[in-house]
């Protein structure tokens, strides 16, 4: 085990932020009030006079430099009390020595100088706050003009969460160094609605999910060079460092390496940052060690020590890495004919194995790769007018129907919902949106899961006439009754929103999944696309090699059960992560009960 082992939480890790040698004091802390400055805190008056005299003669004075680094209220108090100490020294027979008096002259001059430096520091702080306000004003003007369009770019979404969870609190700390009760009061009220650390973690993981699914390198994401993007958005060095640090804290060394390498790339390009290169190398060396690349871990540690020779832990790690390499060399000497493993010597590492067996197929389909829509299959797909099942409304105004897949039969209908209906459905759903859940196969209880990242709500017909209208339309199109169907579910996929491969129907070991409903299994799925998606967001069927892309106003329909009532395992499907855009869908799950005469059983088990 690495001698100087590092815990994943930031408290035991070597600080991942630039830490001032003199951290700012909180003016609200009673320890820094005037009343609590005693002799031990401030030095005695005579000692202060002597220190000031030394400083006036140009000598090094680290203790006074420490005192002048504190924040506004303590610093003014310190300066005043030091000056009182000087006066005390004068009263203590300083006038008897012109030499002492001249020292005081220099001391007073330096006091004025330090006071001006303090004022300049406060003005610089104010200028920094003004610059931030100007930047935020321009940014919010752009974002509020088209919130969904702005957030359609995943980098914008990530940076919004990061700003509210990290940057605004940092600004609060800066403002707290001065009197700003009005701003702090307002910020304190607003902060209860700010994203949390969990939100920032989720946003960062979403970017990494997009990175993996669509094979994007960190440089592409950092530059914001994504397809279909409406707004330019980039990641700074510190943003990239935040991504890498989060991956590190999650034990995800694969992404730690990718993002820390991006940090180094941008630092080498001359970008300004608060993070130091030594800190980046610290994370990177440990991450590549965890990935098994000992030679590179050694090389990175040497680079770290060249920048910070006093880094004790790095020195210990260096000796340990050298020891491990020597052990490996000794072990390979008797078998020199054996080919050395080409393990990541070029700094390229394999993505860790995943819990999802069809991960590669699923993600390939999301990218439009591996779609098995052969010319032979295409010949079996047709477009037609759908008149329903003798429904009078559809005889007068049939729907355009297009085959998306032949077996199992998956069809798309056009102009199913109007723009007005879509907006009304979204308006009804937004106040009710909550983290989408999945049904635990063992307990039947609904719970959140990392493989389903979206928010959803359920709408009843009594909520608005448009809900009843859409329900009736789906009934007319499918020829199935909605009386035993589930409520209309509306889902919104944000940045990196997805639903990994799953079945809509309950399998044999999940017999209690829909027991509470008392309507049997989910016989069919009707999925409405209520938005266009600039990039990503396809509905894919890994076992089929099918990919269906969202198109606003259209809907896709398929049966989950064979006519025998057995589940059709070919319908295992997924909602791909949204790369660019905002994906809105609504779906209706039809159940078995009530469909006996509308979709009767077939003559064989596989019908």
Residue ranges with predicted function:
Residues 9, 22, 26-29, 35-38, ...:
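Intrinsic-disorder-associated, low-complexity terminal segments enriched in Asp/Asn/His/Tyr and depleted
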Residues 10, 14-15, 30, 66-68, ...:
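Generic short amphipathic/hydrophobic targeting helices enriched at N-termini
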Residues 71-557, 561-607:
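Fe(II)/2-oxoglutarate oxygenase catalytic core
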Residues 2-7, 41-83, 276:
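Classical eukaryotic N-terminal signal peptides for Sec-dependent ER targeting/secretion
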Residues 11, 31, 49-52, 59-62, ...:
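Polar low-complexity intrinsically disordered regions enriched in Ser/Thr and small residues
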Residues 17-26, 39, 58, 70:
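Generic N-terminal simple sequence motifs
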Residues 21, 31-32, 43, 47, ...:
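The N-terminal extracellular segments of secreted preproproteins, especially immediately downstream
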Residues 3-4, 9-22:
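Small-residue-rich alpha-helical packing segments, especially N-terminal targeting/signal peptides
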């Amino acid at each position: 085990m690495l001698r100087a082992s590092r815990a994943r939480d930031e408290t035991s890790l070597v600080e991942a932020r630039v830490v001032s040698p003199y951290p700012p004091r909180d003016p609200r802390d009673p320890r820094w009030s005037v009343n609590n400055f005693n002799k031990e805190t401030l030095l005695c008056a005579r000692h202060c006079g002597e220190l000031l005299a030394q400083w006036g003669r140009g000598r090094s004075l680290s203790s006074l430099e420490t005192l002048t680094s504190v924040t506004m209220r303590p610093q003014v108090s310190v300066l005043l009390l030091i000056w009182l100490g000087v006066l005390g020294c004068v009263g203590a027979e300083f006038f008897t020595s012109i030499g002492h008096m001249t020292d005081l002259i220099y001391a007073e001059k330096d006091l004025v100088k330090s006071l001006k430096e303090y004022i300049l520091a406060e003005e610089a702080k104010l200028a920094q706050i003004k610059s931030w306000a100007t930047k935020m004003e321009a940014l919010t003007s752009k974002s509020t003009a088209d919130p969904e369009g702005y957030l359609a770019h995943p980098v914008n979404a990530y940076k919004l969460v990061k700003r509210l969870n990290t940057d605004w609190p940092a600004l609060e700390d800066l403002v707290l160094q001065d009197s700003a009760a009005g701003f702090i009061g307002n910020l304190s009220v607003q902060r209860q609605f700010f994203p949390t650390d969990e939100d920032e973690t989720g946003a960062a993981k979403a970017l990494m999910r997009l990175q993996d699914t669509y094979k994007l390198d960190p440089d592409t994401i950092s530059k914001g060079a994504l397809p279909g993007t409406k707004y330019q958005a980039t990641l700074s060095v510190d943003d990239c460092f935040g991504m890498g640090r989060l991956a590190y804290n999650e034990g995800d060394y694969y992404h730690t390496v990718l993002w820390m390498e991006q940090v180094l790339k941008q630092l080498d390009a001359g970008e300004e940052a608060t993070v130091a290169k030594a800190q980046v190398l610290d994370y990177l060396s440990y991450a590549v060690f965890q990935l098994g690349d000992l030679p590179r871990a050694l090389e990175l540690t040497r680079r770290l020590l060249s920048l910070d020779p006093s880094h004790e832990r790095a020195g210990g790690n260096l000796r340990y890495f050298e020891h491990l390499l020597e052990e490996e060399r000794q072990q390979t000497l008797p078998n020199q004919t054996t080919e050395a493993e080409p393990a990541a010597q070029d700094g390229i590492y394999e993505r860790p194995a995943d819990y999802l067996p069809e991960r590669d197929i699923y993600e390939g389909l999301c990218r439009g790769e591996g779609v098995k829509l052969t010319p032979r299959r295409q010949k079996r797909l047709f477009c037609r007018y759908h008149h329903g099942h003798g429904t009078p409304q559809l005889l007068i105004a049939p729907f355009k129907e297009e085959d998306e897949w032949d077996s199992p039969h998956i069809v798309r209908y056009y102009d199913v919902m109007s723009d007005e209906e879509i907006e009304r459905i979204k308006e009804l759903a937004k106040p009710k949106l909550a983290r989408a859940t999945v049904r635990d196969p063992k307990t039947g209880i609904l719970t959140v899961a990392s493989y389903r990242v979206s928010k959803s709500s359920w709408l009843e017909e009594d909520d608005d006439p448009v809900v009843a209208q859409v329900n009736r339309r789906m009934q007319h199109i499918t020829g199935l009754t909605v009386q035993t169907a589930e409520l209309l579910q509306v889902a919104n996929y944000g940045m990196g929103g997805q639903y990994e491969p799953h079945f809509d129907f309950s399998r044999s070991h999940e017999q209690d999944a829909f027991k509470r409903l008392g309507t049997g299994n989910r016989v069919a799925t009707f999925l409405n696309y209520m938005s266009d998606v600039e990039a990503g967001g396809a509905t894919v069927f890994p076992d089929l090699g099918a990919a269906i892309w969202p198109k606003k106003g259209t809907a896709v329909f398929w049966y989950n059960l064979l006519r025998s009532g057995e589940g059709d395992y070919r319908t295992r499907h997924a909602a791909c992560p949204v790369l660019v855009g905002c994906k809105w869908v609504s779906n209706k799950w039809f159940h078995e009960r009530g469909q006996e005469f509308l979709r009767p059983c077939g003559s064989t088990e596989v019908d």
